[in-house]
Amino acid sequence: MKLKTNIRHLHGSIRVPGDKSISHRSIIFGSLAEGETKVYDILRGEDVLSTMQVFRDLGVEIEDKDGVITIQGVGMAGLKAPQNALNMGNSGTSIRLISGVLAGADFEVEMFGDDSLSKRPMDRVTLPLKKMGVSISGQTERDLPPLRLKGTKNLRPIHYELPIASAQVKSALMFAALQAKGASVIIEKECTRNHTEDMLKQFGGHLSVDSKKITVQGPQKLTGQKVVVPGDISSAAFWLVAGLIVPNSRLVLQNVGINETRTGIIDVIRAMGGKLEITEIDPVAKSSTLTVESSDLKGTEIGGALIPRLIDELPIIALLATQAQGVTVIKDAEELKVKETDRIQVVADALNSMGADITPTADGMIIKGKSALHGARVNTFGDHRIGMMTAIAALLVADGEVELDRAEAINTSYPSFFDDLESLIHG
């Protein structure tokens, strides 16, 4: 696909698609609750559609009509054995969280995904689930998909310290803990996105959170709810960066989720000197309007507890750093290696091919700016965030063309991305 290049300004206002993390969880909680759940503004990207289809295959009635998802919940013990293997597509969130959901089901399932998902290690989830009494295994010692799982009605509660900062592992164990008899304690390495905790309370569940320690008493019953999904800050991140680095630009992003566990990119933008304004804050929905303008940027250091708050935004932050004066160091981000691609290497290769100066490290990158970008051919390798990062980088290219291979990967999280880009170019 040939990308738009040499754009002189971006202007306009858009609403980004619904938050992917919250969309996944709304389907899961709605399915496990008793009664009806209605979900508004859900993301209809491929990952979320995979989760929706999996729960249909598990016997849940889910209707998508007039822009509203209606779920007839079956309760914690109401899932049915599927007739076929469960297809998780490209979604690591789906396979990991649903492994926890099925921990208490007394039937056997196989879960598989596409080529990219089949390379992602699942041992971080399978090891603690085995301690709870679940029979679960995959391929090689890292338990790569496909996974075979047989749950148990006699789940044991667990006391588990996460060896890595992972909201997916934490959430999988919380879903399992809801079905175990007794108190499970999950201790995080660093605080990660807390959508599962928030939604558990919304659906009538109980838990206690003490800093990095989460306690869930099982078993529990959940009750169907109305869920309004805010815009995804991970999708908004591409426009935040575009507005900062494309000259003569001003972008307004409406209804963006600003849950405090997800706003690391805002902290980074401010540390780099970017012009960003937050208005129309809704404390209940945890959403706001974000406005950015073209800015002179300076390098910064990104690491530690900040990383889980922006792990998915690091590819586009790397592009931002190429347009800042000085050096930006990203560290403590080895988790990037086991995303849809090895994002440390793939980001560096993609942007370096366009003229950036990025040195990959064991746990991040060293980025020297400011770089003039030029044309190149870039492959997403099936990674949606690499595709969108490249499309934003291309806007700065004055010399040559930018070709993007496997651009369809962007549909994973942002099917309307190129439509929104066109509207901002002509705004």
UniProtKB/Swiss-Prot annotation:
Query: Which keywords accompany this UniProt record?
Result: Amino-acid biosynthesis, Aromatic amino acid biosynthesis, Cytoplasm, Transferase
Disulphide bonds annotated for this chain are none
UniProt pathway annotation: Metabolic intermediate biosynthesis; chorismate biosynthesis; chorismate from D-erythrose 4-phosphate and phosphoenolpyruvate: step 6/7
Binding site residues for phosphoenolpyruvate: K20, G92, R120, Q168, R343, R385
Q: What is its EC number?
A: 2.5.1.19
- Similarity field: Belongs to the EPSP synthase family.
- Which HAMAP family does its entry note? EPSP_synth
Which named protein is this? 3-phosphoshikimate 1-carboxyvinyltransferase
Source species taxonomy = Bacteria, Bacillati, Bacillota, Bacilli, Lactobacillales
Which gene is transcribed and translated to give this protein? aroA
